[in-house]
Amino acid sequence: MAVKRPTYAKDGFKSVSTRGCIIEFIATMTYVALCVPSQMKYGEGFSTAMVYGTVAALLTYAFRKETVVQMNPSVSVAFMATGKITVEQMVANVVSQLAGALIGVCWTCIWLTGSND
């Protein structure tokens, strides 16, 4: 008797990577938007703050997407084959997410503390 796969196994790569990237992108945009008032407090105009915020968010998203996509193919293969995920793959996936989050924090810190002469 064939083993019934879970439904999410069929689109393993999409269900892991795309959804994760979209969630991280929204989180990054929200994070940057919350930092715009801080940037304005240091004497920058709203449009300047928004430009910096958009650039930081897009660069952060690009880095995050790279880390997530690099780590996730092995995860999606495991999903498609068995519908299960090993501890090592789960750890690798979490590490890639954390790396993306750290990149986002670093970009925002540089953006807030950098001098704009």
Regions found by a protein language model. Give the residues of each.
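Membrane-interface helix-loop junctions and terminal tails of multi-pass membrane proteins
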Residues: M1-D117
